[in-house]
A protein has these predicted regions:
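An acidic, low-aromatic, low-complexity terminal/linker signal
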Residues: 1-140
């Protein structure tokens, strides 16, 4: 399975490539009033309105600082597109089944743990594999 490895805060996360529609540089976000704090607003993506979500806030981390490495990853889930803000896109990795260790849902208070469904091992590094569907569909 191929994953895009991204950096969010100090951690590396993997997003299954089958959900990724596009990766774009950060751009102006139009705020939308009365929405969840992690919902940053919308952008105009080739004439389409695309909502943007802060992965940092959703995962219980410090608010985003947009830099020249910041990217919006446009994911398509259940027919809808949504952009997620990541601090950096690192690489594409291919993980074999034996490189992936499934983990059960956490019952602790760590927000990030609720959205990680496996840990991938690549060249001695650990990559938390995000359950991007539950991350986006929940509460939206």
């Amino acid at each position: 399975v191929q994953y895009i490895v991204v950096k969010i805060g100090n951690e590396q996360y993997g997003i299954d490539i089958k959900y990724i529609d596009n990766i774009v540089r950060s751009q102006n976000i139009t705020r939308v009033p009365k929405t969840q704090p992690y919902y940053k607003g919308v952008i105009n993506l080739r004439g389409e309105i695309c909502p943007i979500m802060s992965m940092r806030l959703k995962l219980g981390l410090e608010p985003d600082e947009l830099t020249d490495k910041t990217r919006f990853i446009i994911v398509k889930v259940e027919g809808a597109s949504i952009g997620v803000i990541v601090d950096q896109v690192k690489e594409v990795v291919t993980l074999e089944e034996e490189d992936i260790e499934r983990i059960s849902r956490s019952t602790n208070d760590d927000a990030a743990a609720n959205y990680i469904n496996a840990i991938g091992k690549k060249d001695g590094e650990l990559i938390s594999l995000l359950d991007i569907v539950s991350l986006i569909v929940e509460n939206n």
